[in-house]
């Protein structure tokens, strides 16, 4: 599998990490299939989601979560748990290359946010997600949309981050075609509605200034909440495993 990033990329990326608040609500909730927030002890696995913010979000909603990533710093996970009032170790974590991972079980919910776009073969990455889902379970994937304003912002202010993304993975019609060939039903692929622009945090004053400017522009963009290639920050995929 040809990855657009490597371990050093992510090690440097997480050197800048500041513990964030695990949300009470997710911006993606409007796109979750019915019943997805009712964990009731069901299992979930987050692909490529270190340090596990969304794993903890689903823990809060009653899931037993597992985090799989090929770069994991346990101290960061523990710090995130502690800073958000969770008991230490409530998220199981597995440090492994996704493409070498051999699961001991299947999961009720398999999800990733901002993962599949870092690889050249999008269909293969999605298929491997689907392979981890129990029959009757849920697949949920979100990826950024860099084919509109957000992509322009990344190209101008953070070309390295832009180049770490496969822009061809961000075409809804192509995604629907890939999903149609997999053992899935109730498949939905959609642009999210609420516009949002962002830059990843980097060290240095220039990045801080650029992020403030982009944040102000993002506030203005929210006046146009229309799902579209130009304005939507994300594409979301949901499906049920047959």
In which residue ranges do the predicted regions lie?
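Conserved phosphate-binding and hydrolysis motifs of nucleotide-dependent enzymes
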Residues: 48, 136-137
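S-adenosyl-L-methionine-dependent methyltransferase catalytic module, highlighting the catalytic core
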Residues: 17-23, 84, 98-99, 120-131, ...
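A short His-aromatic
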Residues: 114-118
């Amino acid at each position: 599998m040809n990855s657009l990033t490597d371990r050093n990329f992510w090690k440097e990326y997480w050197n800048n990490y500041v513990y964030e608040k695990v949300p009470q609500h997710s911006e993606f909730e409007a796109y979750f299939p019915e019943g997805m927030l009712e964990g009731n002890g069901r299992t979930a696995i987050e692909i490529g989601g270190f340090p596990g913010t969304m794993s903890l979000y689903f823990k809060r909603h009653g899931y037993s979560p597992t985090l799989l990533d090929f770069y994991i710093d346990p101290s960061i996970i523990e710090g995130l748990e502690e800073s958000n009032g969770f008991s230490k170790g409530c998220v199981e974590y597995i440090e492994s290359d996704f493409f070498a991972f051999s699961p001991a079980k299947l999961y009720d919910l398999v999800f990733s946010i901002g993962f599949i776009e870092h690889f050249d073969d999008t269909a293969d990455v999605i298929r491997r997600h689907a392979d981890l889902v129990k029959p009757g379970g849920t697949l949920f994937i979100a990826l950024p949309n860099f084919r509109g304003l957000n992509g322009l912002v990344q190209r101008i202010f953070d070309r390295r981050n832009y180049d770490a993304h496969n822009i061809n993975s961000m075409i809804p019609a192509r995604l629907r075609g890939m999903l149609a060939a997999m053992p899935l039903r109730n498949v939905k692929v959609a642009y999210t509605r609420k516009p949002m622009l962002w830059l990843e945090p980097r060290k240095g004053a220039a990045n801080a200034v650029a992020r403030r400017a982009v944040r102000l522009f993002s506030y203005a963009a929210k006046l146009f909440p229309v799902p579209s290639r130009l304005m939507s920050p994300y594409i979301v995929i949901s499906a049920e495993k047959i």
